[in-house]
């Protein structure tokens, strides 16, 4: 995406469309400087009620004498109810309308805001424009011309605020991480394998010297005795990997955030095989790992002053004669034994080994894991929020605030001691699954057993938000890229506190 800034509307250059924003109930665009130099009368539009300025409402007009072929009127809703999310939605609707008309270049008259909110609102507008500006069509052999998607290529902001470009570029850097994440999730599971993810990590470290990548292959995992990750992998003909990417944005500081993303590149459910209606989207079961890639990429683009390590335990959970059998017991990296009571509760197993490894070897100041862990969280929260479980109130508070800032919202769930009781096994130290009752919280409690003592830890369950079958106002169908904007916002706020 290319950005430009024009300080005066009469000096703008040729584009496919001129966008004029309106608050609901007004007939003057924001900012009102637009009408006079344009000599554009919109009385008939408002008198007929064809356009009312409702949130996300878009009306295209064809006006002669302008440098644009079209004028788009964009409704922002009620001015006294404006919020970052309302602006994301309105400009997301605009972006989708422009994509539908195959427009490439936009001249956008920016609304005027008070100084305290201006930066946040400009970022939200840019997010609304960029987040829908994505398509995954590389698997189509040929498309009819009418079906081809033409993405937005250039946005010229018309504004007196000279900081607009810097803010837009910052958002674009984060959205690049979101796109990268979506591509990994949307790709064929036969392509996006544990080995492919390892190559992606190595490719990032070649492109960005700030990243150091280490990959544990199966032989190294056996040496490390990561018994749970290896157990999940037994049914696959593809070896597992453990990917470690280290980014040192503040080498003088000992503060160190470790994020761990579930990387099940395809989840059949194992011998407890998933049914039709539940298995078809299971290429998305590595969404947590993909979000770690996107976060690392954005951290490099933004030159974040933090020390960050991302760990992705990657494997398929496939069906084979060698698949681990429900009821069998395996030893974890930590040494605790686990009775495998359901082969479709595999994500917590590979995360457990990764959490224990990070706790013992990386000296984390905080641990955050992100995973499509339980279907129960989708039943509880739908696609409106991800689940959060945490042992540390301050960490939870910071993540929740980052979620509010980005609208990748989190809802905190409890870690009551009673959930630990459900993990008791007669034949092992722990059992991996104990039925449907409280299953999201019980799964998180299982993970807690593998986190080092006194290490602040948070678990993000994104099973309901990572892959959506209905598009939203500024989100396409399927992979959402959830977690990237949230984690980057958390890291940005952390860098302000620690530096």
From Swiss-Prot:
Keywords: Aminopeptidase, Cytoplasm, Hydrolase, Manganese, Metal-binding, Protease
Domain of life: Bacteria
One record GO biological process: proteolysis
InterPro entries cross-referenced by the UniProt entry: Leucine_aapep/pepB (IPR011356), Macro_dom-like (IPR043472), Peptidase_M17_C (IPR000819), Peptidase_M17_leu_NH2_pept (IPR023042), Peptidase_M17_N (IPR008283)
Record: residues binding Mn(2+) 2: 262, 267, 285, 346
Record's keyword annotation contains Metal-binding: yes
Cofactor note (record): Binds 2 manganese ions per subunit.
Gene Ontology CC entries for this record: cytoplasm
EC category name: hydrolase
Keyword Transmembrane applies: no
Transmembrane regions: none
Gene3D superfamilies named in the record: Leucine Aminopeptidase, subunit E, domain 1, Zn peptidases
SUPFAM superfamilies associated with the record: Macro domain-like, Zn-dependent exopeptidases
Similarity annotation: Belongs to the peptidase M17 family.
The protein, known as: Probable cytosol aminopeptidase
């Amino acid at each position: 995406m290319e950005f430009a800034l024009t300080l005066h509307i009469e000096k703008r250059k040729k584009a496919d469309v001129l966008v004029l924003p309106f608050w609901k109930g007004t007939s003057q665009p924001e900012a009102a400087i637009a009408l006079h130099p344009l000599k554009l009368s919109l009385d008939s539009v408002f008198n007929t009620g064809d356009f009312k300025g409702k949130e996300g409402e878009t009306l295209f007009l064809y006006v002669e004498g302008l440098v644009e072929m079209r004028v788009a009127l964009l409704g922002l809703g009620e001015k006294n109810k404006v919020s970052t999310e309302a602006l994301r939605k309105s400009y997301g609707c605009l972006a989708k309308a422009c994509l539908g008309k195959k427009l490439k270049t936009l001249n956008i008259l920016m609304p005027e805001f008070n100084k305290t909110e201006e930066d946040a609102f400009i970022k939200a507008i840019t997010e609304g424009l960029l987040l829908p500006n994505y398509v995954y069509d590389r698997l189509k052999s040929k498309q009819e011309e009418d079906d081809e998607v033409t993405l937005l290529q250039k946005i010229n902001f018309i504004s007196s605020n000279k900081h607009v470009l810097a803010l837009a570029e910052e958002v674009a850097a984060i959205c690049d991480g979101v796109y990268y994440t979506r591509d990994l999730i949307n790709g064929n599971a036969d392509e996006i394998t544990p080995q492919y993810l390892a190559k992606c990590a190595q490719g990032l470290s070649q492109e960005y010297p700030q990243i150091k990548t280490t990959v544990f292959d199966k032989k190294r995992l056996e040496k490390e005795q990561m018994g749970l990750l290896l157990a999940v992998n037994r049914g696959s003909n593809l070896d597992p990997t453990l990917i470690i990417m280290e980014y040192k944005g503040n080498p003088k500081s000992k503060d160190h955030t470790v994020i761990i993303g579930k990387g099940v590149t395809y989840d059949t459910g194992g011998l407890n095989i998933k049914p039709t209606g539940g298995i078809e989207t299971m290429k998305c079961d590595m969404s947590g790992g993909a979000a770690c890639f996107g976060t690392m990429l954005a951290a490099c683009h933004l030159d974040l002053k933090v020390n960050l390590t991302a760990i992705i335990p990657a494997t398929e959970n496939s069906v084979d004669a060698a698949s681990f059998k429900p009821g069998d017991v395996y030893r974890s990296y930590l040494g605790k034994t686990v009775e495998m009571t359901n082969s479709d509760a595999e994500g917590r197993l590979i995360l457990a080994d990764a959490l224990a490894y990070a706790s013992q070897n990386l000296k984390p100041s905080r641990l955050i894991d992100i995973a499509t862990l339980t279907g129960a969280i989708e039943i509880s929260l739908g696609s409106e929020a991800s689940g959060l479980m945490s042992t540390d109130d301050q960490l939870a508070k910071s993540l929740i605030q980052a979620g509010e800032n980005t609208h990748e919202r989190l809802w905190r769930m409890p870690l009551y001691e009673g959930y630990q009781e459900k993990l008791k096994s007669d034949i092992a130290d722990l059992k991996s699954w104990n039925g449907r009752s409280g299953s999201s919280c019980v799964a998180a409690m299982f993970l807690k057993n593998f986190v080092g003592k006194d290490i602040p830890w948070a678990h993000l369950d994104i099973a309901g938000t990572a892959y959506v079958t209905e598009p939203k106002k500024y989100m396409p169908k399927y992979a959402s890229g959830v977690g990237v904007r949230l984690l980057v916002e958390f890291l940005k706020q952390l860098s302000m506190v620690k530096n």
